[in-house]
Amino acid sequence: MGAAVLGCLYSVKGSWCSGLSHVTLAREGVREETMDTKKLIGAIVAAFVILFIAGFLVHSVWLGTTYRQMRDAGFSFRPEEAMRHKLWGVWVSDALYSILFVWVYAKGKEEKPWVGQGIRYGILMTLFTVVPSALNDYVVYNLPHTLVLHWIVAGLITLILMGLAAAAILKKPSAA
């Protein structure tokens, strides 16, 4: 029997406190697991880097021509210079998404192989976040259906990569 208070794990036989080196995750007293905060932060950073790089590759490289054609046809986008000045919003959004993405994974991971968990989690999060957002944008804005499909496919690939990274970093070390 144990309890966690301010990052310290207390049990009947004594206490163990690691300051900020571990985070205690508990599920209604069913199971307690101590997770290395460095791994959690590492997974968040990896997810952020994947999300940011994928965003650049998808929107600037892969779909850049599509967006220019839409602008030339009269679709309302901010001028590129104005978007660059608001890039901080993308960083904040990507950071928040990465933190929550990894935190939810860490809270719900199971004692199963990490590769399958990472892939399943990426698919689940795509269905939970990317697909509804893309379909709502398709309904509200005059968007080509191919663009929406590209967003969904790119989101699926990105979130699977993020899921694999989080699962790989947060997996328990194998017993030697």
Go through the PLM ranges and name each one.
Residues M1-G2, V23:
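Short, intrinsically disordered, low-complexity terminal segments
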Residues G2-Y10:
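Extreme N-terminal basic, low-complexity initiation segments
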Residues C17-T34:
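Short, Lys/Arg-enriched N-terminal segments with co-localized hydrophobic residues
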Residues R31-A176:
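Juxtamembrane/disordered regions of integral membrane proteins
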